[in-house]
Amino acid sequence: MKYSEAVEQLMAMTEEVVPASVIAPIIHVHPSVMISQAKKGTWDRGVCNYIVSGRRVKFFRIDFLRKGGWIQ
């Protein structure tokens, strides 16, 4: 699976969620991990936090990013 395809799949599966790595690289995580973790993550003010290998990773809701001017 290409990364861009995985991102599209992730967005479709997680109610308009985009991984933070698309906007600003935090850590590299395999797309399948992002998809499964986004479903289980905790949401707060448009941000989803979860832990991968002991490191905190964030997802951001697309509308949250648009409001902040991060994406068009």
Residue ranges with predicted function:
Residues 5-37:
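Polyanion-binding surface elements
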Residues 26-58:
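Major-groove DNA-recognition helix of helix-turn-helix-type DNA-binding domains
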